[in-house]
Design a protein with these regions (language model features):
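N-terminal loops that bind phosphate or other acidic moieties
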Residues: 1-232
């Protein structure tokens, strides 16, 4: 498919309920993929990059990673994803709890966390955010999964959040908390339950509008209007 870059590491992750999602080395390799992709885009002249992901079930792994990094209970960081029933949500929370209990990921080792209860999407996005800092590209945070990856990147590479721009607050419960930790405030709050770069693309439109206003809107001097004067 034109435009798709094949960086496959393996055919999916393992079932984290029974074994580690991937090996430690595979997690590192996936992070490097993200860094390399941003390097390639930067060399082509791109200055701003929208992150995003595509998948089913990856809010489960993202909630697991968030639970570990934020040191919060699974039920406090887990939402309905694409629209789970209450029963399915309970099952999702239970899977996350059991997976964390089984693998005991070390929150001080991001590669350990991702390899045990994460996914390749989270790992590659983590690398992309780090790549943004390395190569001077502004990185737009999309939804919940993207924000979890941004948090992983900040843990691995402190201050890389200086190159991040928040787009929207996902409906998933702890997205706002993650953005706050990153020092970001998302201007869009639309209760969106999807990632896939959707909110990020809307944010690009908002940025275009802001730049247009800043660069092209008439000033008081342009239209011969006196500046405000302090009333005494």
């Amino acid at each position: 498919v034109d435009g798709v870059v094949n960086k496959k590491i393996s055919y999916g992750t393992k079932n984290m309920l029974h074994e580690k999602a991937m090996t430690y080395e595979q997690a590192k390799e996936a992070v490097q993929v993200g860094i390399d992709c941003v390097k390639e885009l930067s060399e082509k002249g791109y200055k701003i990059i929208v992150t995003g992901e595509m998948g089913i079930g990856n809010t489960t792994t993202s909630s697991a990673v968030a639970s570990v990094l934020l040191d919060r209970k699974a039920e406090d960081v887990t939402g309905r994803g694409a629209g789970l029933t209450s029963g399915a949500l309970e099952r999702k929370i239970e899977v996350i709890k059991k997976s964390i209990e089984l693998h005991k990921p070390d929150k001080n080792d991001i590669f350990d966390v991702i390899s045990k209860v994460g996914g390749y999407d989270i790992a590659a996005l983590t690398g992309a955010f780090i790549g943004g800092a390395m190569y001077g590209a502004a990185m737009v945070i999309d939804g919940f999964i993207s924000s979890v990856a941004a948090l992983c990147a900040e843990k691995l590479c402190p201050k890389c959040s200086d190159f991040m721009i928040a787009s929207h607050v996902s409906k998933e419960s702890c997205t706002a908390d993650i953005l706050k930790i990153l020092g970001k405030k998302a201007p869009i709050n639309a209760d969106m339950c999807l990632g896939e770069g959707t909110g990020g693309m809307v944010m690009l439109t908002a940025l275009d509008t802001a730049l247009c206003v800043y660069n092209e809107m008439s000033t008081f001097d342009d239209i011969n209007v006196e500046s405000y004067k302090e009333l005494k």
